[in-house]
Amino acid sequence: MPEWGTLSQLTGDPRYAKAARKAMIAVFERRSPLDLVATKIDVLSGAWRSRTATIGSYCDSFFEYLWDSWQLFSDADCKRMYDVCTVAILKHQQVWKDHQLWFADVDFETGAVISTEQDELASFYGGLLGQGGALKQGAAYTESWAKVQASYGVLPEGYDYATSRPTQVTNALRPELADAAFTLWLIDRSPRWREIGRLHFEAMKRWNKAPFGYTDLADVTATPKRQADHCPGYWWSEQMKYYYLLFANTPRFDYFDNYLSTEGNILKGLRPIQA
């Protein structure tokens, strides 16, 4: 919706925004009686192809773009849908373990726990919670991931909060924790979020640096950590941008009125160079 809505604004053609908005509403209207949505839906029939409700991959951008459509276009319906989904997530998926906040994958119709595994992609969610007004939970969830980072140096792709062990030992040079730290810092300017961002950046330099750039890791539990041989495209679009904006205080960016897409594209808040 943010990208398609922006395209409609730039071209003057409302079809792009209407199509994206229609798809978001279609998913929301098929939510369960618990107000949860699942990870997979048949786009032709509208039937669910999964029973799993998660804040991680397959659902993460849906929640993010509901809020973003409110932030970017003042779409009150998207704000309402975001609020309904978030209340349901906090009611049915929120889990506290050893004073750390996590979010279980649950059956979207019964609320029964399906998995206690978290994928690294979900670590963005603390920032989104903060944006939506649940700053206490957003801060707590980000701190939970920061503790995992402290344990392994860099985040594993999968982590089971029930066993406190990685379920996937790779690291894909992902930016989500830095994203959350930057988003939370924009909200309250706490130095803690800069500290988490700094540790994320320094760990990347230490472990992911290769002779000609940066690469993902094959095993974050190995000593020393074992590198793979791949640099994903989102690293260029997101990662370095979050680090830079978190510390640069650049006059080129409006730190109070801005919007970055899920791929880190600045759709609002970029200022011209002053002559």
Question: Could you say what each language-model-derived stretch is?
Answer:
Residues M1-A275:
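Glycan-recognition and catalytic cores of secretory/periplasmic carbohydrate-active enzymes
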